Amino acid sequence: MYIGIAHYLTVSAIMFTVGIFGIFLNRKNVIIILMSIELILLSVNLNFVAFSAFLHDLVGQIFALFILTVAAAEAAIGLAILVVFFRNRGSIAVEDVNVMKG
């Protein structure tokens, strides 16, 4: 069975939609919002890799590696900020993040 580019784009669109719904439907938990953003970035990476393989060009795959690197750094920094915020406030609810001073 041949898996064409349409299959990859369908899976990527589903992943992107789930990520968008995760952001808009769950506004109380910051960790789930970060996970939804990561899911959106992974769906974009899947698009880059699928088109790169379809067009026989490595630029999309190299760009996807750069996006993965930036996404890993973003997740690490975001989680570190959340850990410090939890130690100071005792909660990581979005309502508590909105009352930050500075």
Curated annotation (Swiss-Prot):
Lipid bilayer topology: Multi-pass membrane protein
Major place of residence: membrane
GO molecular function: NADH:ubiquinone reductase (non-electrogenic) activity; quinone binding
InterPro entries referenced in this protein's UniProt entry, alphabetically: NADH_UbQ_OxRdtase_chain4L/K (IPR001133), NUOK/Mnh_C1-like (IPR039428)
Gene Ontology cellular component terms for the protein in this record: NADH dehydrogenase complex; plasma membrane
The reaction(s) this protein catalyses: a quinone + NADH + 5 H(+)(in) = a quinol + NAD(+) + 4 H(+)(out)
Top-rank lineage group of the source organism: Bacteria
Pfam families: Oxidored_q2 (PF00420)
Classification via PANTHER family: NADH DEHYDROGENASE SUBUNIT 4L-RELATED (PTHR11434:SF21), NADH-UBIQUINONE OXIDOREDUCTASE SUBUNIT ND4L (PTHR11434)
Record's function text: NDH-1 shuttles electrons from NADH, via FMN and iron-sulfur (Fe-S) centers, to quinones in the respiratory chain. The immediate electron acceptor for the enzyme in this species is believed to be ubiquinone. Couples the redox reaction to proton translocation (for every two electrons transferred, four hydrogen ions are translocated across the cytoplasmic membrane), and thus conserves the redox energy in a proton gradient.
Name of the protein this chain belongs to: NADH-quinone oxidoreductase subunit K
